[in-house]
Regions:
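A glycine- and charged-residue-rich anion-binding loop/surface
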Residues: 1-442
């Protein structure tokens, strides 16, 4: 309601495309959806001016930053939105003094912020055109976001871009930037814009009069209400930093431009310098050296797995020999060290079961703890199953003390938990579960 009351006093004169500052009058202030008479130091309110050079967030472009000052007050602009058509609302923090409706003010956009925003938005158009030049006309933008120094663009494409394709897109974009192409904006009718091939976002609604932004004429021609540089060279160098999936048939590229590009370059250089010092090779030999180390690491891990498996299985005989007699059934219930995973533990359980006599019932239940979690596996032989002993039932009996769950078939079952301290109690329940089954089937 407050916005509509302010809108009735007249539309905001939006001059962000042509100016970075303006003298204005405070038309009103809003807090919590209600009109208020004023705001004092430390408070945050929404403020409406009769004229503003501040760009309101839209079209994927972040809002401007800056200050609004007047006789006895200073405001920091932290956000700018257009909640209803024709009304620009500034979210401000009162840095000093007191502001009230009717006061005269001077609105000043942060010049560095705006330059960065223009670089990023024009850079978005350049990347879009480069994608279409490299991939073809089906690579069509479906959304974007840009703020000073950073841009991301979502586009239709069925698969990940190869490293070579990504490099080609980046090269085409930077060639267009270095070509110092003119950037021009003009208003025309929507039918005329479509006739000359201006690209529009699918699903977006447009007025009958639209704004077209061109970079190098027809090379890049899009419907756009954002702020832009005057020549492509002002975008500065551009680096595509990532390319990812954002859904079926949709990809996203992210890039840095201007000052943020140089920050990225410094970080990459520091990374390479660190690698060359650590690996003690020149920069151009880093990939080969890393690959060599990875190959050696994989070989070492493979050998470690082999030795670990041998060590685990070496204990199978001792475990089988330590089986307890529970109602005529040989029961092995133990915790094994080494932090075995489910697969390794299963192999050990089956090995121990194979060492038990097939002429009498046999149950093997082993548990292992690793990284604060519990793995447990149970296996029964055929003789035990004939006595109605089920591995699945035993696993379910073990689960509560270790805060877990499990299940499986009558011959093999497994589970996991999050309370390793409950392992001793869980192993005691194995003997109880077997004894109950054997006595019940007798």
């Amino acid at each position: 309601a407050a916005y509509r009351q302010l809108r009735e006093r007249g539309a905001t004169d939006f001059i962000a495309h042509s100016a970075l500052e303006a003298d204005a009058t405070v038309l009103g202030l809003v807090r919590d959806g209600e009109l208020v008479s004023g705001a004092t130091e430390g408070e945050q309110v929404e403020l409406v001016l009769d004229v503003t050079p501040f760009y309101a967030e839209s079209g994927g472009q972040d809002s401007d930053a800056g200050t609004i000052t007047g006789d006895g007050f200073e405001l920091e602009v932290v956000d700018v939105q257009r909640p209803i058509k024709g009304l620009v609302v500034h979210t401000v923090r009162v840095v000093r003094g007191e502001v009230a409706a009717g006061r005269s003010a001077h609105a000043q956009v942060d010049r560095e912020w705006r330059l960065g925003a223009c670089q990023a938005h024009s850079g978005t158009h350049v990347v879009h055109a480069a994608l279409r030049q490299v991939l073809g006309p089906t690579a069509l933008q479906s959304g974007s976001y840009n703020r000073p120094g950073y841009l991301r663009l979502d586009f239709s494409w069925p698969q990940q871009l190869s490293a070579d394709t990504r490099s080609e897109v980046e090269e085409v974009a930077n060639l267009a930037i270095r070509a110092d192409l003119p950037v021009q904006a003009f208003y025309t009718s929507l039918p005329e814009a479509r006739r000359i091939g201006a690209l529009a976002l699918f699903g977006e609604t447009y007025d009958e009069e639209v704004r077209v932004v061109e970079i190098g004429g027809e090379w890049s021609r899009e419907l756009c209400g954002g702020t832009h540089v005057l020549h492509s060279s002002q975008v500065g160098p551009l680096a595509i930093t990532s390319e990812t999936s954002v859904g079926a048939g949709m990809r996203r590229v992210e890039a840095l431009v201007g000052r943020d590009f140089f920050g990225y370059l410094r970080r990459e250089r520091a990374l390479v310098d660190g690698l060359t010092q650590t690996l003690r090779v020149p920069a151009d030999q880093v990939p080969e050296r890393v690959q060599s180390l990875l190959d050696r690491l994989r070989a070492a891990e493979k050998e470690l797995d082999r030795l670990r498996a041998e060590s685990v299985l070496a204990g199978a005989g001792a475990l089988a020999a330590a089986a307890k007699d529970v109602g005529g059934v040989a029961v092995v219930a133990a915790e094994v060290p080494g932090g075995l995973g489910g697969g390794e533990l299963r192999s050990l359980v089956l090995d121990v079961r194979g060492r038990l006599s097939p002429d009498r019932g046999g149950v093997v239940a082993l548990a292992s703890r690793a990284d604060g979690k519990v793995n447990f596996v149970v296996a029964t032989n055929e003789a035990a199953r004939l006595q109605q002993v089920s591995a699945g039932e035993v696993v379910r009996a073990m689960a509560p003390p270790v805060g877990g769950r499990g299940g499986g078939k009558d011959d093999v079952a497994q589970g996991g938990g999050t309370e390793p301290d409950g392992i001793p109690q869980a192993l005691q329940l194995v003997e109880a579960a077997v004894g109950q089954r054997v006595s019940g089937s007798a």
